[in-house]
Amino acid sequence: MTLKSRMALLSLILLAVAGSWAASGQAAETLSPDVRRLQTKWEAIKFGVPEGDEQTKQMNALGEEADAVAAHYPAMPEALIWDGIITSERASMASAFSALGLAKRARDILDQAYNIDPAKLDAGAPTSLGVLYYRVPGFPVGFGDKAKARQLLEQAVKLAPNGLDAWYFYGDFLYTQNECAKAVEVFQHALKIPQHSDRPLWDKNRRLVIEELLAKIQEKK
């Protein structure tokens, strides 16, 4: 495979990831003001700014803020998780030549959070890592690894029985592996999870995506 074709493949797959990065709910957890600000801004940019140059510009600016927060709180998994999520989002918006570098950086940041506490933010670290491992291409283009993704996402749903993102992304992974019957079970569980009244925009959009995927599976029958 030529470098040009590798970049084209990477670009297509990362484009498909856009809009899918985990943003774990944490109704029962108290975030620091700095981390809460990152979460609020991410939601405003993600769901309130149309896709395109302006959204990318704002997400990149938020990425600089997230890097600073993570540097200030290097032992706080919540800060690292949100830095990883935002860096992942930037990767999904970037050109093919910079996307993989951002994805690798997001992986490394999330690994740090995972090593501190994999259960934090409804298993935000293993969930977000799992997304990276099943959405980024594998060798020789990238570091994707379906087996590792499965292991991380299975761990995430065990750690977060009421984690909407953990269950959504596990179901989405199963759907991409054509394990549709299991995916339906997982998606149905996700929809039964109590709504996050403190994050209505994210909660509504995540459930809409789950319902759309359930409809796609039903159409295949």
Predicted regions and their residues:
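Short coil/turn linking the two alpha-helices of tandem helical-hairpin repeats
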Residues: L38, E43-G52, E89-S98, L121, ...
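Short coil turns that delineate tetratricopeptide repeat
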Residues: P74, P118-K120, P161
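TPR alpha-solenoid repeat register
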Residues: A79, A123-A125, A166, P200
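N-terminal leader/linker segments that initiate helical-solenoid repeat arrays
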Residues: S24-E65
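Terminal, low-structured helical/coil segments at or just beyond the last alpha-helical repeat
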Residues: V186, K192-K221
